[in-house]
Amino acid sequence: MKQYLDLMRRVRAQGTPKADRTGTGTLSIFGHQMRFDLRQGFLLVTTKRCHLRSIIHELLWFLNGDTNIAYLQQNNVSIWDEWADDNGDLGPVYGRQWRAWGTSDGRQIDQLAEVVRQLKQDPDSRRIIVSAWNVGELDKMALAPCHALFQFYVANGTLSCQLYQRSCDIFLGLPFNIASYALLVHMLAQQCDLQVGDFVWTGGDTHLYSNHLQQADLQLTRDPLPLPQLLIKRRPATLFDYRFEDFELTGYDPHPAIKAPVAV
């Protein structure tokens, strides 16, 4: 994952100091792209230990269309706690938009089910896109979508994905986001009888928080290690029937974890 460290170096060298919604302050650049070959290993950062269990549970939660943190809390995943209301609700965030986008005439669109249909029936389509950026519901969301839109592309039997992330917390958020979408590509490839291809990440406001700079500098002293391998042990009936125990990671021997505060 040299690309990730190169991005961090770029922001440290060229980033502009900016104020932000959280009041923390950032070093920020605008516009950056990274390309990863998913065939080379599972995209989990090795220059610090990442919490794959949380990544898997969060993705399963998204895929279930859930927007209440009860499932996450039951599985000891706390990454959304700071934004939930007293009832654990987050409003119409990712899961709602992915699985039940509301239309003006009262219908609901399951964008991910449509992705599966298109990948199987019309894989050359240029419209295999999922958006979480529902302008009409942004004011109801506890947190506006950071990873806002993603598109799939099939060529020569391989499945690739490009994500546009309008706002990116490089140190804490980005390793989660990359691994989550890599996992989704692996799941969709299995469901649609494809091989994994590339994951392309495109960032808008791409930043290091001012209270993450020392941690970033420490991470930049470390050399990337070999990527782990992902095994999906079962092929469920649909994309929405995967369980946590279906996934096994082997060969993950990263550098030690580096703690940093979350900007809320």
Curated annotation (Swiss-Prot):
GO molecular function: thymidylate synthase activity
Active-site residue numbers: 146 (nucleophile)
PROSITE patterns found in the cross-reference section: THYMIDYLATE_SYNTHASE
Source taxon at top rank: Bacteria
Methyltransferase recorded as keyword: yes
Keyword annotations of the record: Cytoplasm, Methyltransferase, Nucleotide biosynthesis, Transferase
Subunit text: Homodimer.
Family: Belongs to the thymidylate synthase family. Bacterial-type ThyA subfamily.
Protein name: Thymidylate synthase
Native organism: Sodalis glossinidius (strain morsitans)
